[in-house]
């Protein structure tokens, strides 16, 4: 995928999440946050140890987020260009799963399967890493 295709698909097929991401970005910029680039996506560092959240081609992560976390969120932005409107529902399921994992592992000490065991999360990580390591591949 080219950069041009990424943005065309983000503003057409992936428009619902792109608009939501832009609205959140505007609020954050009003509050003094400044966007940074990661691949073709824009991101904001919010908090210190926040994991991450992608909304369209914009994602949010903590100040100390690893490059793997950023690549994972970047992968979700690429999924937005692939799944478009359906990604709204996958994102809601992903958010519910994230909070389930947080409660079960962090609060209750339960051991759960790897976070990337769900195809959607695994695909985001693999896609994000692929595009960061080989951005000129189409």
Task: Describe the role of every protein-language-model region.
Residues 3-37, 41, 45-49, 89-138:
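Metalloprotease/metallohydrolase-associated module, dominated by Zn2+-dependent proteases
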Residues 40-66:
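Active-site scaffold of zinc-dependent metalloenzymes
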Residues 63-79:
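Short alpha-helix carrying the canonical HExxH Zn2+-binding catalytic motif
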Residues 74-92:
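Catalytic Zn2+-binding segment of zinc metalloproteases
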């Amino acid at each position: 995928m080219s950069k041009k295709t990424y943005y065309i698909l983000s503003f057409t097929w992936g428009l619902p999440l792109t608009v939501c991401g832009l609205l959140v970005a505007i609020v954050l910029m009003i509050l003094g946050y400044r966007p940074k680039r990661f691949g073709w996506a824009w991101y904001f560092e919010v908090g210190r140890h926040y994991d991450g959240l992608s909304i369209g081609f914009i994602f949010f992560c903590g100040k100390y987020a690893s490059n793997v976390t950023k690549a994972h969120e970047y992968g979700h932005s690429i999924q937005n260009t692939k799944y478009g409107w359906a990604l709204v529902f996958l994102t809601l399921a992903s958010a519910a799963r994230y909070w389930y994992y947080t409660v079960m592992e962090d609060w209750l000490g339960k051991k759960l399967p790897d976070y990337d065991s769900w195809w959607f999360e695994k695909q985001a990580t693999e896609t994000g890493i692929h595009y960061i390591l080989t951005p000129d591949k189409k």
